[in-house]
């Protein structure tokens, strides 16, 4: 606010003197700059400096640091690219649901997304993490949780539309909490004059591991290599809501991904090596 007051004083002095020897051009430029930065005085900035959305960095991180999840790389990067595309107007908020047992990389990938999209990464004021057992522990308080959650989303999206809301341990979340976000992820242009179409919602759940392991093994027995498996190979399970009923039955999910167990990947590798040895011995 000191900068703005100083600017006003300079304009007043120049007006009284009747001339500023070209200084007015500088004042106009400074005024334009400060005008663009005004939102930053009252809250978090919402420009490309704070939200660079570096998809190349995300792709590189996933390739270098994520092991054994071939379905994740292309699906996640493409979904984010198309959602925050300057030449494309998103029709609705992006909703991504990640399933799998502990330690398969769900939170790791979510962290990579935050670090690639935002300059401050996980510390960005545009990133919001909710953990079911910490933030929504009591079933009796579901109506209160719904009100607070809706209020929090509205307030932050009003300041900047490019927000990420992450819900961890969805399988432990009391039924009904996620109903609060339904209006924000539907095909509405505006709700109360607020645009929610650029928002990203990520749901993390520990369900579905056994189901996908069995299906992955079946595909492998049919001769489909793990790196050749596609998201379409799991669409039937997804359409049946086999992974997480608390999300699939309530939320229109844009991208649904099942993270595969790392021990299963090791088993596939060992079996493939045994097959190679057997072929050589024949």
Question: Residue locations for each model-derived region?
Answer:
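Pre-Walker A (pre-P-loop) alpha-helix and adjacent loop at the N terminus of AAA/AAA+ ATPase modules
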Residues: 52-94
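Short glycine-rich substrate-engagement loop in P-loop NTPases that contacts/grips substrate
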Residues: 124-160
């Amino acid at each position: 606010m000191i900068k703005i007051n100083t600017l006003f004083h300079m304009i007043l002095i120049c007006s009284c003197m009747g001339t500023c020897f070209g200084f007015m051009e500088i004042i106009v430029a400074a005024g334009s700059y400060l005008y663009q930065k005004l939102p930053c005085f009252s809250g978090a900035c919402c420009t490309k400096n704070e939200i660079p959305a570096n998809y190349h960095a995300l792709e590189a991180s996933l390739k270098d640091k994520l092991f054994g999840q071939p379905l994740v790389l292309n699906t996640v990067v493409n979904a984010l690219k198309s959602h925050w595309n300057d030449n494309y107007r998103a029709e609705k908020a992006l909703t991504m649901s990640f399933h799998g047992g502990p330690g398969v990389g769900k939170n790791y990938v979510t962290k990579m997304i935050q670090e690639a999209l935002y300059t401050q990464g996980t510390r960005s004021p545009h990133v919001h993490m909710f953990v079911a057992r910490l933030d929504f522990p009591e079933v009796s308080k579901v109506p209160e949780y719904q009100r607070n959650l809706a209020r929090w989303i509205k307030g932050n999206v009003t300041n900047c539309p490019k927000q990420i809301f992450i819900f961890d341990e969805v399988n432990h979340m009391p039924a009904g909490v996620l109903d609060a976000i339904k209006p924000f992820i539907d095909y509405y242009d505006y709700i109360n004059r607020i645009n929610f179409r650029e928002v990203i919602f990520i749901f993390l759940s520990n369900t579905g591991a056994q189901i996908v392991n069995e299906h992955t093994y079946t595909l492998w027995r049919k001769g489909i290599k793990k790196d050749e498996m596609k998201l379409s190979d799991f669409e039937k399970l997804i359409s049946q809501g086999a992974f997480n009923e608390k999300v699939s039955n309530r939320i229109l999910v844009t991208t649904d991904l099942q993270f595969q167990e790392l021990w299963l990947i090791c088993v596939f590798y060992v079996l493939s090596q045994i097959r190679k040895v057997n072929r050589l011995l024949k």
